[in-house]
Amino acid sequence: MIIPWQDLDPETLDNLIESFVLREGTDYGEHERSLADKVADVKQQLKRGEAVLVWSELHETVNIMPRALFNG
């Protein structure tokens, strides 16, 4: 189930995004990017509708994923 990111408290949203970014451990190439920059990038993807917050009833967890991969 998609959770509208706009419905979350801003601090809660930031914490979810930060947790996601730290969990992903993505390599950003030759230059390391700050956590704040990575969080801002994910937030922009949510705002543009490229990414969505997804609640898993089975696992009782929230995840962020590309909208194109969501099969809900």
Curated annotation (Swiss-Prot):
Offer one Pfam family short name for this entry.
Answer: UPF0270
The record's section on InterPro entries has: UPF0270 (IPR010648), YehU-like_sf (IPR036685)
Q: Which domain of life is it from?
A: Bacteria
**Bridged cysteine pairs (disulfide):** none
Xref: HAMAP family = UPF0270
Report the sequence similarity comment from the record. Answer: Belongs to the UPF0270 family.
Q: What is this protein called?
A: UPF0270 protein KPK_0377
